[in-house]
């Protein structure tokens, strides 16, 4: 998940990357991310950065911003389904859903949309409709 977010930050600039992992030894690619953006780290065990889940760090970061600052934000979420859903739930409290895009780490088998292994619950296929899917406003 982090590689896609890194590429967005590198190519478009002025980004903050929030990274979550169970522990410090599961964190990768941080130096590359820090070279192009501000990086905030959360670990479940507190071994690096914020002690807790990345969605809790996200909430803390958003609460510290003014409404005008939050209005300018666009979110790109990448990672396992539970983490992405937790992040989206927090983001929806602070911004409009059309500013939230997510790529959930689903298993992709065929890569061309035939097998449906990477289908999101609404039927969109990450391999052909993604990798980032816009959050549904409804």
Label each residue range with its predicted role.
Residues 1-107:
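FNR/FR-type flavoprotein reductase catalytic core
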Residues 56, 112, 134-135:
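Generic structural "secondary-structure junction" signal
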Residues 78, 110, 127:
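Functionally engaged cysteine thiol sites
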Residues 81-82, 86-89, 93-94, 101, ...:
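Iron-sulfur (Fe-S) cluster-binding segments and ferredoxin-like electron-carrier domains
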Residues 107-118:
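Cysteine-centered iron-sulfur cluster-binding motifs in ferredoxin-type domains/subunits
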């Amino acid at each position: 998940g982090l590689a896609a977010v890194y590429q967005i930050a590198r190519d478009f600039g002025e980004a903050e990357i929030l990274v979550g992992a169970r522990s410090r030894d599961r964190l990768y690619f941080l130096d590359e991310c820090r070279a192009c953006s501000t990086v905030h780290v959360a670990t479940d065990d507190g071994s690096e950065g914020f002690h807790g889940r990345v969605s809790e760090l996200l909430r803390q970061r958003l609460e510290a911003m003014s409404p005008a600052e939050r209005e300018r934000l666009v979110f790109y979420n990448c990672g396992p389904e539970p983490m992405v859903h937790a992040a989206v739930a927090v983001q929806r409290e602070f911004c409009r859903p059309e500013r939230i895009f997510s790529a959930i780490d689903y298993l992709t088998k065929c890569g061309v949309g035939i097998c449906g292994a990477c289908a999101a619950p609404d039927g969109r296929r990450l391999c052909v409709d993604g990798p980032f899917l816009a959050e549904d406003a409804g």
